Amino acid sequence: MEFLLLLSLALFSDAMVMDEKVKSGVELETASAVCVYDAYYKDHTKYWCRGYFRDSCNIIAFTPNSTNRVALKDTGNQLIITISCLVKEDTGWYWCGIQRDLARDDMDFTQLIVTDNREDRANGFSSDPSGNRTRSCRASKAVQKAEGSRMSILIICILITSLGIIFIISHLSRGRRSQRNREVTGKSISRNPQASQGPSMVSITLARI
């Protein structure tokens, strides 16, 4: 009987519930979402994914892993998702999910809207009044741009070096061909006087006769 009760709980209950269906955030700040789940699933893998349809959403991270901007924290009955350094491209639909063995993964969604207007900040999002997060995000973006510039310069240097090597090889190849042509021409010239002496000697002999 207890097994049937647990089985029905696994099959028909809502194991994962999102705290809010719509969230608003501000660029360069931090967003956080909380998904509450039944403690029965505390040892199950949870995940955070993006997409309008649950069955085709793109998984961003599984517990206990995180990415450079998305951190997942599993407390045993809550999955806390934190997105740092928000950008407008983060606007979209997101799902928190829990993997289940005997049933379809249970998931719940929220819509995230990121703006550049600080007055549109809504509940569910944390901000740092001192502006440390904003400065950190801007510094991170500056580092990324600097790394991109260094990579572009490196690619240009490699291209210039490659073109220089190709030019040198081409120049040496043309020089060798020219030298061979001169050698062939010299040999031809040295042979022609011998060939031209024949007719002159014949003409002299005929004249004497």
Curated annotation (Swiss-Prot):
Region (Disordered): 179-201
Membrane topology: Single-pass type I membrane protein
InterPro entries according to UniProt: CD300_family_receptors (IPR050671), Ig-like_dom_sf (IPR036179), Ig-like_fold (IPR013783)
Gene this chain is encoded by: Tmigd3
Location of this chain's protein in the cell: Membrane
Gene Ontology annotations for the cellular component aspect, listed alphabetically: membrane
Signal sequence extent: 1-15
Composition-biased stretches (Polar residues): 187-201
Name recorded for this polypeptide: Transmembrane domain-containing protein TMIGD3
UniProt entry keywords in alphabetical sequence: Membrane, Signal, Transmembrane, Transmembrane helix
Segments traversing the membrane: 152-172
Main location: membrane
Gene3D superfamilies reported for this sequence: Immunoglobulins
SUPFAM superfamilies: Immunoglobulin
